[in-house]
Amino acid sequence: MIGRTHHCGQLSEEQVNERVQLKGWVQRRRDLGQVIFVDLRDRSGVVQLVFNSDISQEALETAEKVRNEYVLDVEGVVLKRDPSTVNDKIATGTIEVHVERLTILNKAKSLPFQIEANTDASEDIRLKYRYLDLRRPDMQETMKLRHQTTKLIRDFLDGQEFFEIETPMLTKSTPEGARDYLVPSRVHHGEFYALPQSPQIFKQLLMVSGFERYYQIVRCFRDEDLRADRQPEFTQIDIETSFMDKEDLLTMTENMMAKIMKEVKGLDVALPFPRMTYDDAMNRYGSDKPDTRFEMELIELSDIVKDSDFKVFSSAIKSGGIVKGLNLKGGAGSLSRKEIDGLAEFVKPYGAKGLAWLKVEEGELKGPIAKFFAGETGAELQQAMGAEDGDLLFFAADKKEVVFDSLGALRLKLGKDFNLIDESKFNFLWVVDFPLVEYDEEAKRFVALHHPFTSPKQEDLTKLETDPASVRADAYDLVLNGYELGGGSQRIYQRPVQEKMFAALGFTEEAAQKEFGFLLEAFEYGTPPHGGIALGLDRLVMLLAGRLNLRDTIAFPKTASASCLLTEAPGEVSLEQLLDLNLSIIGHKPDKVNV
C-alpha cells in the first residue's frame, strides 16, 4: 500500500499547488449535490477535501458512498480556499485539497456516539467503545501530553545520569500495604506470586547493588477501593538514589517538575517549592495534601470555647477533642437553612455528628447556638475567626481526626461551590515531618504511615522502641493543587534499625525473617545510605490536562468497580485452567468459572 506524503493537520499554504496523498478518518461529510465536502482527520488534525465532477467524476461518485469514520486514502492538489470560506477554527482553515483519487480503505458502522471533543455519551458507553472514545480530539491531546511528559522525565533523568532498570512484575506478597493482586503458580501448587504495589524493595536492592541512581516508569497494582483519582493499575515515576543528600533529591525533583511545567504548560513555577510540616498542614487545612490555591484555613477555637455553656463544644474538649471553625466570607446571605443542613449531612461520612454554624449580622452572632456565645466569648470568637458582617461561620467539635477530616472536606467543597479556587494556578508544596507510624485501632498495633522501610528522623531514632507514636519520619510528600503527586523518604539501610522498625510494627523476629529475611541479609553486605521518591504519572497528567479523573489519562482504564467494559475483564476461566493451577472455586461447579 502506498504511503502518505503529509498528515492532515500539517498542511498549510506552503503546500499550495502541491500534489499530496493523505490517509485518515471521515470527521464529517456535506453533500451539496454537485460538490461534496469531507473533513478528513488523522492524529495531527483535520483538513477539508473537495470532490466535484470538474476534478474527478470517479472520485465524486465514490465520495457519495462515504460516511462518518470511513477510512480513506486520497490524492489531490492543495489549493487556497476562497476568502469567504476560510475556517478560523482549524489550523488548515485557509486551504483545501481537491481530490483526484479516492479509495475507501474501510467502512464504519453507525456510531454509538459522535467523535467530537464534547460528547453527551455516558462514561460506560465511552469505556465500552474506548477505541472510538480515544479518537476524540481531547483524548488524543491527553495521550499526546502523557507521551510528552514521559519523554521529558526520561530525558531529564538521563541527563542526571540515572539508569532506567526494570524490576519484576511477579514477586512475593508481603504485608504492610493495600491488598495484593495474587497470581497462582502452575509450577508451585498452592503458592502465589503478587503483582507489585510498587518496586520499593527491589529499588532498594538496586542501591545495595551499587547502581546509585535508578529510575523506572513502572506499572503498579493495588487491590483497593477506587475513587476518581485511583485505579487498580497505575503508573509510577519511581526514583531511588544512593549517597544523595535529601535536599539535593528534593531540589532535583523540583527542577524536573519545573521543566515539565515549562515544556508542557508554558508556565514558570517559583523555586524552591514551599514546605509545610504535617502537623501544620492538618491544623491549618485539615489535610496532609492541602489545596493552597485559596485561603479559608481552619481556626483553632478550643481555648475560647472550652468553658462554654454549649455542651457540644465543652464536652468534646473535656474528652480530649478539639473545636475548630471555618469562615465563609460573605456567605451568610448565600446559603439557605436547607442548604446549611445539607452541609451537615455532607460532613457525616467523615465522622462528624453534626455541623454547628453562626451568621454575623450588624456585629452580632445569629443562629441556633448564638445564645451560648453572647458577650465576651462571642467577641473573642469573632476576633479569632476574622468575622465581619455577612460572614457564615462553621464549627466542628470532636476528636481531632474527625475535626480535621470533616472540616478539611467542607473547606474543599465550599471552595469549589463558591468559586474560590483559582483554577489557573499550579501550587506545588512539600509536606514534611510526617509521623513514622500510626495506631490501628482494629489491628491493635502500630502501622507504618508510609511503608516500613522509611527511616525515622535521626533525632527521633532513640524513641523508636519506647515511644513510636512520637517518632517523625524522614519523609516528604509532593502535593499539587490538593492532590498527592507522590511521596518519598530516606530509607533505613542498617539491619538493626530495620529490625527495630519491624518490632515497632508488631513483627516477631520470626515473622520479620520470613517476610523480609532477604532484605535484612542484604543490609549486611555494605548497603549505602539511600532515599527516593515515587510520583504518580497518571495523576500528574490528569492535573496537567485539566481532566476530572484518572480514567481520562489512561488509554484503557478500569471502572470504579475495577472492571474493563471493553474486554469484559475480569472474566471466566475454564475448569481445565483451574485444574492446571490446582485451584477450585468454593461453591462453583460449572464448566466455566467466573473469577
From Swiss-Prot:
The gene is aspS. Its EC number is 6.1.1.12. GO terms for cellular component: cytoplasm. It comes from the Bacteria. Homodimer. It is found in: Cytoplasm. It is an enzyme of class 6 (ligase). Its main location: cytoplasm. This is Aspartate--tRNA ligase. Catalyzes the attachment of L-aspartate to tRNA(Asp) in a two-step reaction: L-aspartate is first activated by ATP to form Asp-AMP and then transferred to the acceptor end of tRNA(Asp). NCBIfam families: aspS_bact, PRK00476.1.
